[in-house]
Structures are given as structure tokens and as C-alpha cells.
Amino acid sequence: MIVLLTRRIFGLILTLIAVSLLVFAVMALLPGDPAAITLGTSATPETLAALRHEMGLDQPLIIRYGQWLAGALTGDLGKSFTYGVPVAGLIAERLAVTLPLAALAILLSVLVAVPLGAAAAARRGGFFDILATLFSQMGIAVPGFWVGLLLVLLFATSLGWMPAGGFPGWGNGVWPALKSLVLPAVALALPQAAVLTRVTRSAVLDTLHEDFARTAVAKGLSRGRVLWGHVVPNALVPVLTILGLQFTFLVAGAVLIENVFTLPGLGRLAYQALSQRDIIVLQDVVLFFAGLVIVVNFLVDLSYLAIDPRLRAGGAR
Amino acid sequence: MTKFSCPSPSVVARKLAFSAVLSTGLLMIGLTQAEAAKTTLNLGMSVEPTGLDPTIAAPVAIGQVTWQNIFEGLVAIDQNGKIVPQLAKSWEISPDGLAYTFKLRTGVKFHDGQAFDSATAKFTLDRARGGQSVNPQKRFFSTIASIDTPDAETLILHLSSPTGSLLYWLGWPSSVMVGPKSSANDKTAPVGTGPFKFSAWAKGDHVDLVKNPDYWNKSVDVKLEKVTFRFISDPQAEAAALKAGDLDAFPEFAAPELMNSFEGDPRLTTKIGNTELKVVAGMNNTRKPFDDKRVRQALMMALDRKTIIEGAWSGLGTAIGSHYTPNDPGYKDLTGTLPYDAAKAKALLAEAGYPNGFSFTIKTPQMAYAPRSAQVMQAMFADIGVTMNIEPTEFPAKWVQDVFSGRNYDMTIVAHAEPLDIDIYSRDPYYFNYKNPDFNELMKKIQLTADAAEQNKLYGEAQSILAEDVPALFLFVMPKLGVWDKKLKGLWENEPIPSNVLTNVSWED
């Protein structure tokens, strides 16, 4: 078991290093010189050279990669070209927006999808089933950013109940910050909830046909108790798997929603860094996303190991 | 745009009842608040600045937050584009134009307590013109040969050659005065002498400024206590933030097609002013067939500027015949030099040896005005048998690399933001690859005199040369689309220099 774990962790580190090399190579191939962008249309060769030197862009690629990697390993992610502040702090600031947003969206989608999916499965073709089908088809078909625009029009522009966008920061109180995350979380949650409703519905349907469910019915338990007490908890495993996958997707994929609501999240940081060729920030953010996916996969692997003894035996060979 | 129907009457009634109770409860507080005029401002901008030091990076957004609010210069440029004294209260220019003697104000302090004097001014200018300088307008200072500071109040600039635009340039955001102790950190924590102090920067969202209680200029009455610059890049989100009341003002609204959506809003007012943003379609003047003046003239005559403005910017914009705006001193309306005439254009093209036209590629940045203009131009060029392919080119990164630095392009389109930058056609190297000794001579002559009337005459001649020679197709000047609260006073309606000067902004009771 320990050997296996060590091997897995070693593999994880190798993967991260490989990813970092790939990310660095891709950045090096991107057209556009950050120094030239900073100086704009009045750049002269002389000022350009001075700025490139200041930014460290005049160093050979291999040295720049080495410096970046060595820095990243010691927790120093470098300084943003455009903002002039350490990238680690920037990412932390953005996570303080993106993580609560993703968590809120997940929470909302679970609260809607699990009861709706289960109720739909309980009575196929019934009212909730039709509702669930309609909801999930709409949720998948309608783009989240468009929903976001509609929400802004209704709740911010017309009714004035909610801010139209922006983020006051957690320093100005929890409520104002939370308030500015509600509409984007709804917009973000809708497509997720749609997928999750479908997954829940089919998982519950499958579980309903399992032996223990039939046994429970045969024992004379009421339909509701069988469904909510036995079937739904057992059907949650595939639902949780999808949720895990969605979380990484939400953290990385909220760019459009963050743009509609002008939220200073991680997705928008990556987008801005790309257009400004703030290469250091972009490298770090991409590496962070990659690391997130790799670590989540690692945790999933570990949980399989914990569940299935056969894998443990196989791994120790 | 989608409209929502009103809530049902019962909902409205319930809401009204609720708010009646609430407002009665808050009446006392409300009354005491109403007596004091509002002293905060939420101002929107489309682009977030990259750093907050205008002396080390070019993006105009930096100056739009900091210039005149945090940082001040020896001189300033006012609402009408005039040079006015600021940290220098007066100056004298020697008869040969080679020595500028400034008398500086005394008792001026930076926000962190550093004193401003001639040594500080010398430090700032040496930093801007030195070998390590990354000042985006370093060329402004290139003729300063040496700087003398006989006493704390006196600054003397000795020039290697007369520089008639020096005073104007010293009024720019890139020429503001910085403190020796604080300049290294100005990018993230700017320290200036202005009426507002930097307070906080939530990257990706907003910058906060607060009133400087120790501001040196007692003749102005700064009313705002706190200003928040919020950065919103999406036009729909900009409009929503204005209508929802999240923002008090958007001095440079980015979407002309949404301007009329503010009509009928009782709280907001719209103002259409001038900017210095010249939208021009630059051509590679050394590449065939653009090396032939007749071809360039034919292309200019194939374009109906009015239609382009209509298509690209909802009709809001001023047609130009040269690289000059109606704001600028000595402006001449030259749109009649090569007016829209497709038949003449076709004949000229045949004369140049292209009776059947030709085809080329335009590299267009993604900013809304560029692809929209290009599409209208494409149709107009087709009328004279010229095929124009549109190649989207990411701005700034790819555009700077391909067009600006690489000069690997046929035609491009971009809005030039620098005020009074007609001299770019004399710069070598510059992306147009335009070379005209007569024009260069004029640009030199302008620097040899500090006499405004003489300069204006020379600028007039320079405009005429460009209008005739068309190194770039001169299309239009962008309007300054201001949207703000009706009770807000003192924001600039025109923009002789990119800025959001808040010194005289206040709320009407």
C-alpha cells in the first residue's frame, strides 16, 4: 500500500513537471512580446530592449524555464508583468471569488437536481418527470451567459434588487459579497443542474430495479420511504462522481459568466493574462488548473483503492 | 433587446406597502442624510489599467485613473487642450529656444510627505530620459541635454535643439512628477501630489481613491471624498451597471449602438464629445500596389466615410481627411480633398495600371470598430473591383508583433489614441513605412518654433500633405460617449488628452 502510494505520488509530481514543460513551451510559441505590448505604439528599439531586460525576457528560454520551475517549487510564482505584484497573491485573491462561486453553484444545482431527478424517476411519465425533462433540456440548450444576461436585466436593471455585476470584496462584509455572487451562481448552476437532474433520474431508476429495493418494497415499506430512505442514498454515488468532475469544470470554466458579471475570478484573470501576454500569470494559472485536475484525479483514484480491495492487491504486485 | 413585463398589480401593491413601512421607519435617517450632498463617485471604465504608473507603460487607461487625480505635471493640459501652469507656476523660454527656466511652486508635498522641489523635478526628468528608462514617451525628453537646479524653486532645462512641443509634452500623463522615494513602487502604490490619494486596488474589479486633505492647491474646492473606478469590459454589463445604479458615470462608454438605450432614463444623461482617437486604415507604403500614390488615392475615393461611421459606430463620429482631430490646434477640414467618388477612383486605378483591380488583406484587431469598418470598406472596395480579405488579428499581442513591429501587412485598421501625433508619419521606423522628406521637414520646423500661430500654420501644411498623399486612409474621429447621473457636475465632455479629471466633479443638491 505504501509502495503504491509513493509510486502514485511520484507519478503525480512527474506529471506536473511534464505539464509545466508543456505549458512553458506553448507560452514560448505564443505570438506577441509582453514588453512591446506594455510600450504600445510609441515603442522604440531602445526602450523595448530596456524593458525586455527588466522583465527578464532577454534570457535564454531554458534559463527562464529553470527559474520559473525552481521558483514554483519554493512557492514563489513570480511577479505579474501587468500588475507588478506577486502572482501567488493574485491567484489567492481570485480564488476567494471563484471558489465560493463554484461552491454556491454546486450547492444550488444539487438542491434543485437531486429532488427533481429522484421525483422524476419515482413516477415515470408523471408530472415531475415531464418537468425534469423540460428543465434538463432547457438547461442544456440555453447558454449560461445568456441566462446571466436575462437575470441581470430582470433583477438588476428592472427591479434593482441585485447589483448588475462586480465584486465588492469580502472585506466589505459577507452579505454584499454573497449578494453579488447569487445571480452568477444561478446562471452557472443551471446547466450543471440540468445535467445532474438527468444523471440523478437514471441512477435512481437503475437503483429502483436492484434487489434490495424490491426487497424493501416486498417488506411492505411505503413507496416514499423506499425511494428517499434506500434508493436515493444508494444512487448518489454516480451523482457524486459527476459532481467531482463538475467542480473542476466550474472553477476553470466560469470565464464567460465572470465576464457577464465582471467578477474578478480566476477565469477572467487567465483571459486577461492571455490578451496582455502576461506570460507568468498565464503559466501559473494554467499550471494551477492542471494541478487541480491531477490532484482531483489522484483523490478519485485513492477513493477507488479504498473501496475496492482487488485494486490494492493488484497494485502491490 | 428583451423587455420584461411589469410585475403583477398585487405584487406591486405588496411591494409598495412594504416600502411605505420601511421608508417611514427610515425617514429620520433619510432626512439627515439628504441634507449632506453626496461625496462619493462610482465611475466606470472599459479597460483596467496595467499598473498605475503612467511614466513606465503606455496604456491610456493608466492616465485615465491617475493623471490629475493622483499625479500632476510641471504643466497640465486643460479641458480645452490649452497648456496651463501646474507644479511650475511660470516659465521663460530663451530667445534661441534652447533654455526653459521654470519657477516651481513651493510648499507642495507628495502624499507620503516628500517635498516637491527642483531636485524632485530633475530626478523625474532624468529617470524618464535615462539609459534604463522605459518611459513610453522617452522621445519627448530626447532633446534635453542637461538640467540645472540653481535653487529649490528653479528648474532650467538646456536643450540640444529647439523643441516647440516640449511644454505640451510636459503636460502629458507620461511626464508627471514622481517622488524619488516612492517612484519604484508607483506601479502598484502610486504616490503623487494630486487632489486624490491612492487607497486600494482590487485587481480585476476596481481602484479606490480618497481625497487628499493636504492638497497644495487651495484655489480649488475638491468635493468628492472617495472615488471608485470600476472596470467593466462587456458593453452589456456596462449598460446594466449604469441602469441599475451601480455606477454614477461612464465617461467613455464603449458601445455606441447601446447609447439610445439610455434615452428616457430619468436619472441619466448622455453627452457626446470629441476624443483624440483617430480611426485610420494604415497601408504598407513600400509594398505593392500601395507604393503607388494613385492607388492609395483611389482607395480613399472609394470610401464614403459617412457610411463607414454609420456602420461602424452608429453614426456617432466625425469624418476626417487627415491625421488630425477638430480638437487639435490648427485643424483643417480636409474631407473634401479626396471625396467619395467611385467612378473617379476606378479611373485612377486604371491609370495606375490596375484596370481590373487587385486583391489584398487587411489585418483587423478585434475591437468592435475595426471589423465593422472593415466590412463596410470591403463592400465599397468591391465596387471599384478591388478585393479585400479580412484577417482578424488579435490586439494587442499579435497586431503589435505582425503589424507594428514586424510591418508584415498590406493594410490594417486601428484607432490612434495619442493626442497631436501627426508626427508619427515622420517617424522611422514606423509601421506605415511612409517616407516623405517634405513632411519630415515640416515636423522639424514645428519643433524649431514655440510660436503657436506659426506652429498652427505648419500643422495645417502637414495636414494637407497627408490628405493628398494618403499614407493611411483617414476615416473618422471617435466620439467620447459619456453617460452619467444628471446630478453629477464637472466631468469633461471632450477629451483633449485621455483622462478622467475629478478635481471639479461634484454632486448637485
Task: Briefly describe each language-model feature range.
Chain B
Residues 103, 137-179, 200-202:
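Surface-exposed binding/hinge segments that line
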Residues 42, 117-124, 152-158, 194-195, ...:
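Alpha-helical secondary-structure segments
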Residues 44-95, 126, 191-192:
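N-terminal lobe/hinge region of extracytoplasmic solute-binding protein
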Residues 47-64, 87-88, 114, 136-137, ...:
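A structural "hinge/loop" feature
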Residues 23, 39-42, 202, 206, ...:
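Detector for C-terminal structural segments
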Residues 82, 163, 168-222, 226-228, ...:
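Gly/Pro-rich hinge or "lid" segments in bacterial periplasmic/extracellular proteins
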Residues 89-134, 150, 156, 289:
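Aromatic- and charge-enriched surface segment that lines or borders ligand/interaction sites
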Residues 184, 214-260, 378, 387:
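Ligand-site clamp/hinge motif
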